[in-house]
Amino acid sequence: MLTLILVLLILLVLAEVWTLLLRCRRGHPGWKLLRQYRYAHRGYHDKPHIPENSMAAFRRAIEHGYGAELDVHLMKDGRLAVIHDASLKRTAGADVLVEDLTAEELKQYHLEGTQEQIPLLEEVLPLFQGKTPLIIELKAERGNHAQLAEATCAMLDWFRVNYCIESFDPRCI
């Protein structure tokens, strides 16, 4: 009985330590800045005029004082597309995967029946320099998590943007 109690206590302590390790690091210097903003999910969009994850949606978010959340996919040429879905079907009407395209090929598609093109991360980041922060969600596909994370970090090194990176694939973080 004593052994069982000791095992349960050890498991309880380990669970508590694990919980503490997973807590957000609120002491990080950037945390206070990020918490000062509200965020426009996929930019400040409205159908049918301003599509999600478009340059117009990001400009509108900044104009209204919002930070923005955006999604990033790695393309076959190593460039980073800003789009939520792995496929262009819902947002651009084409049954093609983002990761199977190059940046040049991506430019032929338009978002949701508008003239807005699917932006590259390198086009979006300058909008946010010295302005509102970004929440960047990494969307890994087919095991490209390491390349996606490396390409995103390399791109962020070129711009003075306040940001937070998130992903539902823990291998990206």
Positions of predicted regions on the chain:
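Phosphate-group recognition and catalysis centered on beta-loop-alpha active-site segments
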Residues: 2-173
